[in-house]
Amino acid sequence: MEPIFIIGIILGLVILLFLSGSAAKPLKWIGITAVKFVAGALLLVCVNMFGGSLGIHVPINLVTTAISGILGIPGIAALVVIKQFII
């Protein structure tokens, strides 16, 4: 098969996906996840700022941000408990 023919088929399928609206669903999911991760990071910053006087410090990295973003307040509480008693 000619490369032009293959590129044309792929381009046609991409245009069909955009016209049908199904390409927006994964982008929406990625956006929601990104907002949750940012909110989790901000919550961890607040915990580190206000918990600093109590000796509470949770490192901010991808794993802790994901846990606090997805689980919310219970996730942050779990991270603090793990940090204080296990590590």
Curated annotation (Swiss-Prot):
GO molecular function: metal ion binding
Signal peptide: none
Species name: Bacillus subtilis (strain 168)
Location(s), subcellular: Forespore outer membrane
UniProt keyword annotations, A-Z: Membrane, Metal-binding, Sporulation, Transmembrane, Transmembrane helix, Zinc
Alphabetical list of Pfam families matching this protein: BofA
Residues exposed to the Forespore intermembrane space side: 1-2, 58-87
Function: Involved in the mediation of the intercompartmental coupling of pro-sigma K processing to events in the forespore. Inhibits SpoIVFB-processing activity until a signal has been received from the forespore. Could inhibit SpoIVFB metalloprotease activity by coordinating a zinc in the SpoIVFB active site, preventing access of a water molecule and the sequence of pro-sigma K, which are necessary for peptide bond hydrolysis to produce sigma-K.
High-level lineage: Bacteria, Bacillati, Bacillota, Bacilli, Bacillales
Disulphide-bridged cysteine pairs: none
Keyword Zinc: yes
Gene name, Swiss-Prot/TrEMBL: bofA
Membrane-traversing stretches: 3-23, 37-57
Residues involved in Zn(2+) binding: 57
Assembly: Forms a complex with SpoIVFA and SpoIVFB localized in the mother cell membrane surrounding the forespore.
InterPro entries: BofA
GO biological process, one term: sporulation resulting in formation of a cellular spore
Protein name as annotated: Sigma-K factor-processing regulatory protein BofA
Spans within the Cytoplasmic topological domain: 24-36
Topological category with respect to the lipid bilayer: Multi-pass membrane protein
GO cellular component, one term: membrane
Predominant subcellular localization, coarse grouping: membrane
